[in-house]
Curated annotation (Swiss-Prot):
Stored InterPro entries: DNA_ligase_B, DNA_ligase_CS, DNAligase_adenylation, DNAligase_N, NA-bd_OB-fold, NAD_dep_DNA_ligaseB, NAD_DNA_ligase_OB, RuvA_2-like
Entry EC number(s): 6.5.1.2
Active site per database record: 125 (n6-amp-lysine intermediate)
Name of the protein this chain belongs to: DNA ligase B
Name of the coding gene: ligB
Pfam families assigned: DNA_ligase_aden, DNA_ligase_OB
Function: Catalyzes the formation of phosphodiester linkages between 5'-phosphoryl and 3'-hydroxyl groups in double-stranded DNA using NAD as a coenzyme and as the energy source for the reaction.
One GO term of the biological process aspect: DNA replication
SMART domains noted in UniProt: LIGANc (SM00532)
Annotated SUPFAM superfamilies: DNA ligase/mRNA capping enzyme, catalytic domain, Nucleic acid-binding proteins, RuvA domain 2-like
C-alpha cells in the first residue's frame, strides 16, 4: 500500500550512533535487546509503509534506528542486518524516474556541503507523502506512490479526485513530475505546532478507495522536481508556474551561503506556511538527467531538518525523590540527550501511581519534550526493554509531613529537602546557604548547625576561613529571626498564626478545641496543627531553639493564652 519518505532515515550515520556510549551488557543480553528493538522497528516500518499509519513520530523513529545501528557497532552478536525500512512496500508500478532519497545533514555538515557547491536553491521540506505524476500529451496519465523508490502503488484514481493535481495541463506535454501531497493547514507555525499529524492524514486519505470532495480539497500538491525539465532551475520553475504549479517557484529560493540558508530555514520554521514541514531541502540547480537517477540519496540534494521537538532517551535508573512534606516523586535518570540546546539527564514523573501506570524500567526508551520550552517532561514510552529490571519503590507510609527530622540512609532525601526549605527565602532566608551548603555539613539533626562554631566549620573539607566566617554570620542571623518565620521554616501547617502568635510554650500546649477557635481553622486544619505541635521531634527542635536563645521560643511571663 503506502510507502512514504521515512526510508531516507538510515542514509547518514548521525550523532547518536557516533557519540552514544555502548551499553554495559553481556553479549547474551545485547543479542536479545538488539533483536527486540529490531523487531519493533520492523513493525513500525510495516505500519508506516504498508498500512498508512504512523505509530511513532519521524524524529523518534530516526533516533531509534540510529540507536540500533550503534548497538550493531558495539556488540559482535548483534552484527546482523538492520531491518530494511521498505520491506514489502514496493508496488507493481515502475517509476519512470526513480524517487531518490535525501541525506540528512546536521548543522556542522551543512556548511561544508554548501561551501563546496554553487547554483544552490532551498525549499521547505514539505511534510507529506511523495508522489510521481506522469502526463501524456498534457493529460494526467498516472500517479504513483513512492514505494521503494523504484516501484510504487497506482494512485491515479485518487489523484484525479484532488483539485490540487491538474488532470490537464495548458500545453500538450509529456513530462514526469515528482512532488509531495500535503494536508492543507491554516495559521500553521512549525515551531509552535510541529507536524500536527498532517502527514498521517494525507497517508490515510490516499489509502482509501474513495475520497469525499471535502477531503480531496484538503490535500495540496508541492512539485519539488522535474527530472527531465529545462537544464536551469530558473527555467524549470518558470515553466512549472506556467503549467499551473506556482508553489514550486514561490517556495524555491536561490542561496549563496550557509547564512542565507539558515535565514530561510528559520523563516519557514517560525512563519506561517499552508503545510507542515520538517526541515529544508538544499538542491543544486544543475543535476544529471533523470535517466541517471537512482533510488538512493543523490549528491546534488540534501535535507537539513528542523530542531527536534522530542528526544528518544534511554532510562538508566528510576530514582525516587522525597520532598520535605514526604511526597514521593519518581525521577527517571536518563542517558543524557540534547534537546533545543539543553542537556537533559533527568525527568520527573509526578507521582508513584503515574510511574506504576507507565511501568517505566531501566533500559526502556522514552520520548522527552520540553514543556514551556524549559521543563523536560516524559511524553510517552516508545519501547520497552525485554529485560524488566526490578525497581525498589519507597513505602509511602514511611514518608509524610512529620517524618525524617533526622539524617539516616532512608531519610536522606526528605531531610535534605527540609534543610533546603529552612534556609530558602520562604524559610529563614539565610544568605549564601543552600542545598550545596547543607550537603557539605555533617548534620544528624535539623538544627545541629546552630552548634557549629567558626573553628569547626573551617575544619570541614572545602570550607576555608572566609567561607566559615560567612556561614557563621548567616547562622547567627538565624537566631534573630522572629517566631513566625521560624515556624514557617520548620514546616508548620497553614493556620499556625491564625489569630496572632503566642510564644512557643503556649503553642505546644494547645489542644484541638483551642485550634478550632482560631479564625479560619477547620477540623482538618486543627488535626494537622495539633499533630505538628505535639510531635516529639518538633518539640525536641523547640527545646533546641530555646537553648540556643531564639527569642520566640522563650516562655513569656504570665499564664499561657489559647
Amino acid at each position: 500500500m503506502l510507502a512514504m519518505k521515512r526510508w531516507i532515515a538510515p542514509l547518514l550515520l548521525p550523532l547518536i550512533a557516533q557519540a552514544e556510549p555502548c551499553p554495559d551488557w553481556p553479549d547474551s543480553r545485547a543479542q536479545v535487546e538488539f533483536a527486540a528493538l529490531s523487531q519493533q522497528i520492523a513493525q513500525w516500518d510495516d505500519a508506516y509503509h504498508n498500512q498508512g499509519r504512523s505509530p511513532i513520530a519521524d524524529e523518534l523513529y530516526d533516533q531509534a534506528r540510529e540507536r540500533l545501528q550503534r548497538w550493531q557497532q558495539c556488540f559482535a552478536p548483534a552484527r546482523q542486518p538492520l531491518p530494511e525500512p521498505l520491506t514489502g512496500s514496493a508496488g507493481p508500478i515502475a517509476h519512470p524516474v526513480p524517487q531518490t532519497g535525501l541525506r540528512k545533514l546536521n548543522d556542522a555538515a551543512i556548511g561544508e556541503w554548501i561551501g563546496s557547491r554553487d547554483d544552490l536553491w532551498i525549499q521547505p521540506k514539505v511534510d507529506g507523502v511523495a508522489v510521481t505524476l506522469v502526463y501524456r500529451q498534457g493529460r494526467l496519465h498516472q500517479a504513483i506512490s513512492r514505494g521503494d523508490g523504484r516501484h510504487g502503488q497506482d494512485w491515479s484514481a485518487r489523484a484525479r479526485q484532488l483539485p490540487a493535481v491538474p488532470t490537464r495541463l495548458p500545453e500538450a506535454l509529456d513530462l514526469v513530475l515528482q512532488g509531495e501531497l500535503y494536508w492543507r493547514l491554516e495559521d500553521h507555525l512549525q515551531a509552535r505546532d510541529g507536524g500536527a499529524g498532517a502527514r498521517g492524514k494525507v497517508a490515510g486519505m490516499m489509502a482509501r478507495h474513495e475520497l469525499s470532495d471535502t477531503d480531496g480539497a484538503a490535500i495540496g500538491l508541492f512539485v519539488w522536481d522535474w527530472p527531465d525539465g529545462p537544464a536551469s532551475m530558473d527555467e524549470r520553475l518558470s515553466q512549472l508556474q506556467a503549467l499551473g504549479f506556482a508553489d514550486s517557484q514561490h517556495y524555491s529560493k536561490p542561496i549563496r551561503s550557509v547564512e542565507e540558508a539558515r535565514q530561510w530555514r528559520q523563516h519557514w520554521y517560525r512563519h506561517r506556511l499552508p503545510f507542515a514541514s520538517d526541515g529544508v531541502v538544499l538542491r543544486q540547480g544543475t543535476r544529471p538527467a533523470g535517466a541517471r537517477w537512482q533510488a538512493e540519496a543523490p549528491h546534488w540534494a540534501v535535507a537539513w531538518k528542523y530542531p527536534a521537538s522530542q528526544a528518544l532517551a534511554v532510562v538508566q535508573a528510576v530514582d525516587f525523590r522525597i520532598g520535605r512534606s514526604g511526597r514521593i516523586t519518581p525521577v527517571l535518570r536518563l542517558q543524557p540527550v540534547d534537546l533545543d540546546d539543553r542537556r537533559i539527564s533527568r525527568v520527573a514523573l509526578g507521582s508513584v501511581p503515574t510511574w506504576k501506570s507507565l511501568d517505566v524500567r531501566p533500559g526502556d526508551q522514552v520520548a522527552i519534550r520540553l514543556a514551556g520550552l524549559t521543563i523536560p517532561r516524559l511524553d510517552s514510552v516508545i519501547w520497552r526493554s525485554p529485560h524488566r529490571a526490578p525497581v525498589e519503590v519507597p513505602r509511602s507510609a514511611d514518608y509524610h509531613a512529620l517524618s525524617c527530622w533526622r539524617s539516616s540512609p532512608s531519610c536522606q532525601h526528605q531531610f535534605q529537602a527540609r534543610l533546603a526549605w529552612l534556609s530558602s527565602k520562604q524559610g529563614l532566608a539565610l544568605s549564601g546557604v543552600g542545598p550545596g551548603t547543607w550537603s557539605s555539613l555533617p548534620l544528624q539533626g535539623l538544627l545541629d548547625w546552630l552548634e557549629l562554631d567558626k573553628a569547626q566549620l573551617q575544619s570541614l573539607p572545602g570550607i576555608g576561613p572566609r567561607r566559615a566566617a560567612q556561614l557563621q554570620q548567616a547562622f547567627a542571623q538565624a537566631r534573630d529571626r522572629p517566631l513566625q518565620q521560624w515556624l514557617r521554616a520548620l514546616g508548620a501547617p497553614p493556620g499556625f498564626d491564625a489569630g496572632g502568635l503566642d510564644d512557643w510554650p503556649s503553642l505546644i500546649e494547645r489542644q484541638r478545641d483551642d485550634w478550632l477557635r482560631r479564625p479560619g481553622v477547620g477540623p482538618k486544619g486543627a488535626d494537622r496543627l495539633l499533630a505538628f505541635f505535639s510531635h516529639p521531634e518538633v518539640q525536641r527542635l523547640g527545646r533546641q531553639l530555646q537553648q540556643a536563645g531564639v527569642a520566640g521560643f522563650q516562655p513569656q511571663a504570665g499564664p499561657p493564652r489559647s
